[in-house]
């Protein structure tokens, strides 16, 4: 039977064409794809034990609830996956909801939002006893012990308990329950260590205030994630380097490149932008609270930044100042003219120890580091990176304000016990782009990647070279699309002949 061409056939052809076009490879897409994230959590009976004693103000308790919600968001919640219970405590213990109560993430999050503080004393031992003997029991929804099901308790507290936690914690650990202890503010750190499982550096966390407790959420999201290495399996879209983390990955670039805003592709870094000069000075806290092993990680962090700079007399210069109770200039701007020499000097830097005089160090930066006599160049962008792990023992506000008033681009990097208010005082505007915090020295390399993007200014998108590159890219995409359309047209012609 002969089928003639007509409106119906034209409509059919158009639909076929659209279906085939939908199969055009993703590589032709002009829209950046999001960074990879895939996480499956192993089946877990998880109980939060949350201190809401009178020392925890209502606004601070709200921040705890945000932290809890962020951790829950990352879990596979369900009767056969992760079950979550919550125990609220002060002088008494109040079970907010048992493990069996909520089979979905949405209902769990609603239950967390409804929790109110109790506002009396601090009976942490009593709360732990309840969590272990009641909250994880069969009657409350706890499952039978099995190698396939984890039993986890996370304690959040900000004070010294009015009872003992040692014995009950030992019994819990002996029975196979994994204990995490999170301390806030003036918490008794010895108590945290008595509660937590080994290794303690993975099970004890401390933050200066409730304002930064949310920053711990990522750690717990990764702790519960058991998905395979996405970089090793090739399930990523990074142009150069893939850096794996549990259930996720981030893209990185080779030495001399910086990551673009799409989080996947890389550009050559030119120190303060193509053809511009940057004077960059690191102001590094070498106080005793840092500890020698962490100071070595700080040195690696510095060299990670140096690796991305185009070091030369015309472009990027680097200086380094270490401070504690006193200030020591390790090397001024312009002393070293190659990355290799700068990195060697950083590796050879010795650890000062003693106190934390951040205010005096900032004043030194202003009065000495960015002067012509110390190698600074008139007209060059002035960038200061302040790295600290604790509260300053002197006043920082005046010096921090003056540095920004002079036009210095100031970045503040805090680790562990660093005080958020001080970091924000140091950071340039917008503060969100110039202030960085992590709870653990082991993760400062992630801050390094973010800093690289801020220091390395993108070239002018309207510059002639950029326009030519864009035009060439678009032309290539159009040619590829044209070839695809020609192939589709050929297939349609063959199909039409067969039908006829």
UniProtKB/Swiss-Prot annotation:
Quick one: a GO cellular component term? extracellular matrix
Please provide the record's keywords in A-Z order: Coiled coil, Disulfide bond, EGF-like domain, Extracellular matrix, Glycoprotein, Repeat, Secreted, Signal
Q: Where is carbohydrate linked to this protein?
A: 80, 348
Question: Which GO molecular function entries does the Swiss-Prot or TrEMBL record give?
Answer: calcium ion binding
Annotated GO biological processes are:
chondrocyte differentiation; extracellular matrix organization; growth plate cartilage chondrocyte morphogenesis; regulation of bone mineralization
Using the record's annotation, list all stretches that form the VWFA domain: 30-226, 268-457
Which Gene3D superfamilies does the annotation name? Answer: 1.20.5.30, Laminin (2.10.25.10), von Willebrand factor, type A domain (3.40.50.410)
Q: Where is the EGF-like domain?
A: 227-267
Kindly give the PROSITE patterns that the UniProt entry links to this protein: EGF_2, VWFA
Q: In which tissues is it expressed?
A: Expressed in femoral head articular cartilage. Expressed in the trachea and extraskeletal tissue around the eye.
Q: Where is the protein found, in the record's own terms?
A: Secreted, Extracellular space, Extracellular matrix
Q: Which ranges form a coiled coil?
A: 471-499
Q: Which residues form the signal peptide?
A: 1-29
Under the heading InterPro entries, the entry gives: ECM_Assembly_Org (IPR050525), EGF-like_Ca-bd_dom (IPR001881), EGF-like_dom (IPR000742), Matrilin_cc_sf (IPR036337), Matrilin_coiled-coil_trimer (IPR019466), VWF_A (IPR002035), vWFA_dom_sf (IPR036465)
What does the record say about the knockout?
Knockout mice are phenotypically normal with the overall length and shape of skeletons and skeleton components at birth comparable with wild types. Histology of proximal tibial growth plates of 15 dpc embryos and mice at birth show no morphological differences. Collagen fibrils in the collagen matrix surrounding zone of maturation chondrocytes and zone of hypertrophy show an abnormal unidirectional organization and also contain sporadic larger diameter fibrils at both 15 dpc and at birth. No change in deposition of Acan or type X collagen matrix in the proximal tibial growth plates at 15 dpc.
- Name the source's superkingdom: Eukaryota
| PTM per Swiss-Prot/TrEMBL | N-glycosylated; reduces binding affinity for type 2 collagens.
Describe the function of this protein.
A major component of the extracellular matrix of non-articular cartilage. Binds to type 2 collagens and forms long concatenated protein networks as part of the extracellular matrix. Required for the network-like organization and bundling of collagen fibrils surrounding chondrocytes in the zones of maturation and hypertrophy. Required for mechanotransduction and adaption to mechanical loading in cartilage chondrocytes, resulting in an increase in expression of the extracellular matrix components ACAN and COL2A1. Acts as a moderator of angiogenesis in response to injury.
Its quaternary organisation is:
Homotrimer. Part of a complex composed of MATN1 (via VWFA1 domain), type 2 collagens and type 6 collagens. Forms a complex (via covalent bonds) with ACAN; the interaction increases in abundance with increasing age of the organism via an increase in occupancy of MATN1 binding sites. Interacts with COMP.
Q: What is this protein called?
A: Matrilin-1
């Amino acid at each position: 039977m002969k089928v003639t061409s007509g409106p119906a056939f034209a409509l059919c052809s158009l639909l076929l064409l659209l279906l085939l076009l939908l199969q055009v490879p993703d590589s032709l897409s002009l829209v950046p794809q999001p960074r990879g994230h895939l996480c499956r959590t192993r089946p877990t009976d998880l109980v939060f034990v949350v201190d809401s004693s009178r020392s925890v103000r209502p606004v601070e308790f709200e921040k705890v609830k945000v932290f809890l919600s962020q951790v829950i968001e990352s879990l596979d919640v369900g009767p056969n996956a992760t079950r979550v219970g919550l125990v609220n405590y002060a002088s008494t213990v109040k079970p907010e909801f048992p493990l069996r109560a909520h089979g979905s993430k949405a209902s769990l999050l609603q239950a967390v939002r409804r929790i109110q503080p109790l506002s009396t004393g601090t009976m942490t031992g009593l709360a732990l006893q309840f969590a272990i003997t009641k909250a994880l029991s069969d009657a409350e929804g706890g499952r039978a012990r099995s190698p396939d099901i984890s039993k986890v308790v996370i304690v959040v507290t900000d004070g010294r308990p009015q009872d003992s936690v040692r014995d009950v914690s030992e019994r819990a650990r002996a029975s196979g329950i994994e204990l995490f202890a999170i301390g806030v503010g003036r918490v008794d750190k010895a108590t945290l260590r008595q509660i937590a499982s080994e290794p303690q550096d993975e099970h004890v966390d401390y933050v200066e205030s409730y304002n930064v407790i949310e920053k711990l959420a990522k750690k717990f999201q990764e702790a519960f994630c058991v998905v395979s290495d996405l970089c090793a399996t090739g399930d990523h879209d990074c142009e150069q380097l893939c850096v794996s983390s549990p259930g996720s990955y981030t893209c990185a670039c080779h030495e001399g490149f910086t990551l673009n805003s799409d989080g996947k592709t890389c550009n050559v870094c030119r120190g303060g932008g193509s053809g511009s000069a940057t004077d960059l000075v690191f102001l590094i806290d070498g106080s005793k609270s840092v500890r020698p092993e962490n100071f070595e990680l700080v040195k690696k962090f510095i060299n990670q930044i140096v690796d991305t700079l185009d070091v030369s007399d015309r472009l990027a210069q680097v200086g380094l100042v270490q401070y504690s109770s006193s200030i020591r200039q390790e090397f001024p701007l312009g002393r070293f003219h190659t990355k290799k020499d700068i990195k060697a000097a950083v590796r050879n830097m010795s650890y000062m120890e003693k106190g934390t005089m951040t205010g005096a160090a900032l004043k030194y930066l202003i009065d000495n580091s960015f002067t012509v006599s110390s190698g600074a160049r008139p007209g060059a962008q002035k960038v200061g990176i302040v790295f600290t792990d604790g509260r300053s023992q002197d006043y920082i506000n005046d010096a921090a304000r003056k540095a920004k008033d002079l036009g210095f681009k100031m970045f503040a990097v805090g680790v562990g016990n660093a005080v958020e208010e001080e970091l924000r005082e140091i950071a340039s505007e917008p503060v969100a782009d110039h202030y960085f915090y992590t709870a653990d020295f082991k993760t400062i390399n992630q801050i390094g990647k973010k800093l690289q993007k801020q220091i390395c200014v993108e070239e002018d998108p309207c510059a002639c070279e950029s326009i030519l590159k864009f035009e060439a890219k678009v032309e290539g995409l159009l040619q590829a699309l044209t070839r695809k359309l020609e192939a589709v047209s050929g297939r349609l012609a063959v199909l039409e002949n067969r039908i006829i």
